[in-house]
Amino acid sequence: ISKMQNPRILRYLIENTTDESIIRLAKEKLKFKPLSAQEEAMYQGIVNFKNIQGLGGFNDAIIREAEAKLRDGGTYTVHNPDFLTGANISVTLTNEFMHAVENDLDFELRFPDVANYSPEEMAIYNEEWHKVGDVREWEKLGHGVRVYRTIKARELWNLINICATYAAEPGIFFIDNANEMTNAKAYGQQVVATNPCGEQPLAPYSVCNLAAVNLAQFAIKDSKTVDYEALRQTVKVGVRMQDNVIDATPYFLEENKTQALGERRVGLGVMGLADLLIYCEKEYGSEEGNELVDEIFKTIAIAAYEASIELGQERGSFPFLQGETAAETARLREAFVNTGFMKKMPQHVRDGVREYGIRNSHLLTVAP
């Protein structure tokens, strides 16, 4: 609500929400300026031309706007329209929250009870919370947690969806799904955050350089097919380039540098999908279109991991996958090939990691 810049949506929330806090916050964000007597007379004068031939030189849009101003009695805008405009926000949603949404249950909004922490507890919070990032895990560790309020899950779900639809924010991030699939589990880490646009789940202090393959370049227009071999080669060049970027990057925090060099995370994605579908005469969302998209992304995923395995042979695996002994390295590699994501990869890719290791902990990211 604090980032909403559309007064019409704020008014919709006020009129269609039953949660008192949402209504209060929407009202606080909404700004109303009543019409002066002069403005009211001006708009009324415009409306008076509504039923006169030629509309007095005004068009329908101007007359409708004048009617709306008179109906509302003023102009709606928002307070602090520039609030956090330079930041993208995502909301982490848990399985428990989605269960509450599906079953129309109440949901507790919980957070560490920092207001009642002792100085010692606050020091632990400042040092450790960002590494955990999950109030459920924080509570399991024995730290104090407070229920700040209870809300109907569907009210919050509807708020998120309305704001995302009409303001492109917040992003929706299913954190339990991310942790079930992430390769970071192999080396004892977990997802606690995302990058600004929400496409890259991140462990504490993780950073990830991003790149995109232009899919439109791989359409064979005469045959309306895809040049998969050229796509594979481009992906492999892209992975090699991004691995080089990791070493060429200036890091502002030592923790970022340690994490970046330790897991060597890269995010290769795509652009130009719509153009490719047009060139191949496939409709977006159709069965044929979806089959083509599946094949394209399967090709990219396999090629990227094959390239990283080759780099692992040349340059060594990412350090977090290297143990102090051969047995420890083998254990880490086995854990890696059994993450939620890697279980979906072809057997030859998993076997390649077991035998040669892999240069990068993560490889694929499609930006929104």
Identify what each model region corresponds to.
Residues 159, 272-276, 292, 307:
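A general alpha-helix detector
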Residues 205-211, 237-240, 271:
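Short coil-to-beta-strand
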Residues 222-232, 282-286:
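Structural helix-adjacent loops and short alpha-helical linkers that scaffold large soluble proteins
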Residues 1-215, 219-228, 251-255, 304-325, ...:
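Active-site cavity-forming subdomains of large catalytic enzyme subunits
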Residues 112-118, 234-257, 261, 283-368:
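Internal maturation/activation junctions in enzymes
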Residues 201, 260-265:
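Structural motif
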Residues 212, 264-279:
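Contiguous, well-ordered alpha-helical segments that form the cores/surfaces of helical PPI scaffolds
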Residues 164, 184, 263-265, 366:
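Short glycine- and Lys/Arg-enriched binding-loop motifs that mark or flank ligand-binding interfaces
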